[in-house]
Amino acid sequence: MIQGTTSDAGKSTLVAGLCRLARRAGVRVAPFKPQNMALNSAVTIDGGEIGRAQALQAVAAGIDAHTDLNPVLLKPTSDRGAQVIIHGKARMNLDARAYHDYKPVAFEAVLASYARLKASYDTIFVEGAGSPAEINLRERDIANMGFAEAVDCPVVLVSDIDRGGVFAHLTGTLACLSDSEQARVRGFVINRFRGDVSLLQPGLDWLEAKTGKPVLGVVPYLHGLTLDAEDMLPRELRAAQASADALRVVVPALPHISNHTDFDALRAHPQVDFHYVRAGSAPPPADLIILPGSKNVQGDLAFLRAQGWDAVLQRHLRYGGRVIGICGGMQMLGREVADPYGVEGPPGTVEGLGWLDFSTTLTRDKTLKNVTGRLATDAGRIAGYEIHMGETQGPALDAPALLLADEMGGVRPDGARSADGQILATYVHGLFDTPAACASLLAWAGLKNADAIDYPALREASLERLADTLAVHLDLKRFWEAIG
């Protein structure tokens, strides 16, 4: 089990790399995360929903993503509550206290999934969540040491040296663990190191002498990896590699933004100057503004208005700019969004931005499906997925954005296009991941001679580079011996 001293220490990436190394060696390997809290998710082969990192790890392992890889997924709807997803299906919304009481039920789902994986695979790399040293979360823990103790799983602790304080993080985390939990930690991995590792050696010697546990590797900082992010927005809000005549793309960093992996292909595109715009920052000039998915559409609509984005969008459209709304962003572009059942917050109805003539009602049932099709205006093929709890109706849907294959072998429309051709809205995530669709959409937004980039191929190359790096910078013999 890979646990971290902090969030974003590198657990997800390390598990992905280890899965790829095991796959190369001919080992039947699977990733597993007992409990995940994330707004980036993926649709599985069995029609459920799991964290995006586990879907990436499944690619690394060479297996289909399915719900047993992440049996408990929490999707925050506010600072105090989250939608609880068990075995891929949304069960309920709970606040933090109520979920704490629900954990024994959730743990049963975790153990059931783990048992099925254990029966099917030779090796399972388990990813922890956050840090095991959160004293207030120790009772009924199902994500870190609570799980490791229950199934007798060895632990490797990873820490991010780029943030500073790595030795304090590692020794401090150990100090917060019980004796049995400390004994379960078999060694350390130091992640994101820059510089001459020989200068780090005195610290490594001290750490091993202090704890009696080996340092199993020092992994260098890998720039430019094209891998799906677990939850947080990328550290660099602007993609820096764009050409001088690049298309300017801007996305507001909504408080409840979901599936921002939709934009990874744009961030990697050499002809796109991509910006996330945080609260309080003035949006830069743009050719294309994209309203992203949201786990709280009403709250994020209020945020957009409070930040002046309604006026920004109005001015942008007046001068010929293009706008795309994806999932929750699509819903925001309509007349109104009704939440009669309190799916995302208090029941109620809010006025949308009003640029497309449709209205959305949030429902208790969630749509989860992988889709294929094409853009309605040209032959650009797409392959993506839907994750939403809304039903949208209105005249604007008569001019769809996409034409998708349905279950009967026919075609069904999705989304809407404005009459002037400046606005596209769709429920489909992963819109830019397919090379042909990405090139077509960038050309529609104003990019001359738009190139097609193969984002899945970039991701595959990054997984190979990651595995190559781990093969060099982890002491793999010592690693395998340490975890038994």
Swiss-Prot record:
Query: Record keywords: Transferase included?
Result: no
The answer to whether UniProt assigns keyword Membrane to this entry is no
Q: Name one GO biological process term.
A: cobalamin biosynthetic process
GATase cobBQ-type domain location, by residue?
246-437
InterPro entries cross-referenced by the UniProt entry: Class_I_gatase-like (IPR029062), CobQ/CobB/MinD/ParA_Nub-bd_dom (IPR002586), CobQ_GATase1 (IPR033949), CobQ_N (IPR047045), CobQ_synth (IPR004459), GATase_3 (IPR011698), P-loop_NTPase (IPR027417)
Where does the record place the catalytic residues? 327, 429
Q: Which GO terms describe its molecular function?
A: ABC-type vitamin B12 transporter activity; catalytic activity
Pathway given for this chain reads: Cofactor biosynthesis; adenosylcobalamin biosynthesis
What keywords does the record list, in alphabetical order?
A: Cobalamin biosynthesis, Glutamine amidotransferase
Q: Which family does it belong to?
A: Belongs to the CobB/CobQ family. CobQ subfamily.
Q: What does this protein do?
A: Catalyzes amidations at positions B, D, E, and G on adenosylcobyrinic A,C-diamide. NH(2) groups are provided by glutamine, and one molecule of ATP is hydrogenolyzed for each amidation.
Quote the protein name from its UniProt record. Answer: Cobyric acid synthase
